[in-house]
Design a protein with these regions (language model features):
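Conserved SAM/SAH cofactor-binding pocket of Class I
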Residues: 1-75
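Class I S-adenosylmethionine-dependent transferase superfamily signal
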Residues: 10, 82, 105-109
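Residue-level signal for beta-strand positions within conserved beta-sheet cores that form or flank
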Residues: 15, 41, 78, 139-141, ...
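Alpha/beta-hydrolase-fold catalytic nucleophile elbow
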Residues: 66, 85, 122
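Mobile active-site "lid"/loop adjacent to the S-adenosyl-L-methionine
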Residues: 69-101
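Conserved Class I SAM-dependent methyltransferase catalytic core
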Residues: 95-159
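Flexible, glycine-/basic-rich loop-and-beta segments that form/coincide
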Residues: 161-164
Length: 164
C-alpha cells in the first residue's frame, strides 16, 4: 500500500466499498493509516507479505497492485521525492525474477478474486507484455494496457471468469 495513495483514492471515489490495503512494511502502514485518518477515510490496513503463505479467506471483487518493479540499476531515474517518501522495498525489485510479485498475485487471485472480478497492475514498461502473457496463460480475459501521463504503457487491467 505504500503511502496509501491508491487505497485512499479508491475509498474517496467509491464510498460504499470496503477497502483492504496490504503492505509488509510497518512504516508504510503507519504512514498510510495517518493519511487515511487525515482524510476521514475508513480503510482496513493489514501487515501482509504476499510472498509468504497465509490463510486469508476473503474474496475480492477487485485486486489492485502496484508491486515493486524498478530495477536497482535504474535508481538514478527515480525522483528524490519518491526515494524520500517510499521505502526502497516498495520501489525496487529485490529478486532475480522481475515477475515474482505478478506471478504470486495472479496465483493468489485464483482463490481470492471473485468470478467476474477485475485485477489491475502497475508495471514496468519493459515487463508489461510479460505480465500480459501471464494473465493470458492464467485465463484472464479482456486484457487492456493503459498508458500513464507520460504516454508510457504502465497499467494493465484484466477480467477473471473463475476457474483460472
Amino acid at each position: 500500500t505504500g503511502s496509501g495513495l491508491i487505497a485512499l483514492f479508491l475509498k474517496k471515489n467509491s464510498n460504499n466499498c470496503v477497502i483492504h490495503a496490504w503492505d509488509n512494511s510497518e512504516k508504510a502502514l503507519r504512514i498510510a493509516k495517518k493519511n487515511a485518518k487525515k482524510n476521514y477515510l475508513d480503510i482496513n490496513f493489514n501487515n501482509v507479505d504476499i510472498l509468504k503463505k497465509h490463510d486469508h479467506t476473503i474474496k475480492f471483487d477487485i485486486i489492485v497492485s502496484n508491486p515493486p518493479y524498478v530495477h536497482k540499476k535504474e535508481k538514478n531515474l527515480i525522483s528524490n521525492v519518491v526515494l524520500k517518501n517510499e521505502p526502497s522495498e516498495a520501489i525496487f525489485v529485490n529478486s532475480d525474477d522481475d515477475l515474482l510479485f505478478y506471478k504470486t498475485i495472479i496465483n493468489f487471485s485464483k482463490s481470492h478474486l471473485k468470478q467476474k472480478g477485475i485485477i489491475y497492475f502497475e508495471c514496468h514498461k519493459e515487463t508489461i507484455n510479460q505480465v500480459k502473457n501471464l494473465l493470458i496463460i492464467n485465463k484472464f480475459t479482456d486484457i487492456e494496457i493503459k498508458k500513464d501521463s507520460f504516454g508510457i504503457n504502465r497499467m494493465i487491467k484484466a477480467n477473471s471468469y473463475g476457474d483460472a
